[in-house]
Amino acid sequence: ISESFLSVAGRLLDMQGTERTPASDVSVDLQLRRLTVWTENGLIRQSQLTYQPHLQPIRVESENCIFVADPKSSFIEQHVSSVDGALRLITWFGRRNFYEKFGRFWSVVTGSPHIAPLQLSFEHWKAYWRSEHEQDAAWGGVPWRGPLPLDVPPHAHRPTDFSVMDPSLDDVASDIANRAGCPASELPFVPPLDGYSTGIPGGGTGR
């Protein structure tokens, strides 16, 4: 998926276990480029079921994206029997991404009363993946053009609702525009018109 705005009521990927063990060379691959993504409940969830315990590994490559999620959600959420097994199910390669609003980046719940849920903050997320898997990431600080419509149903969201400031007026907005392939120095001058916004959708080139 590339150069788009996505608004999802649940998650981008919600996976349940299967009865049969998947082949060793089978995985789910997500490639995300220059997106602005709103997911009400986080990006990914994996759930083992009593009679469907087998989950496919997930590999994500994400570059120059802005991920926005409900503050109560977890970016990645897993309901599994083993924390170690859960960590092996996710492979992440991130480059120059922005993360907004949510604070739990990875949550693993085993259901065992003797094992506390694993919850990783942004700093722990970066420490786990290190620079080989998560480069130049930023949490918070996107200069939005206006308040985000967090209480509006996702189906009513518009790309302009998630626009950043005019890149000629803000350094971070300029950086986002550069990552989206629209360097501020190369943007044509457009005189302001009544009812027209000069903001561009963060992380994407759509209008």
What are these model-predicted stretches?
Residues 1-207:
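Extracellular beta-rich repeat passengers
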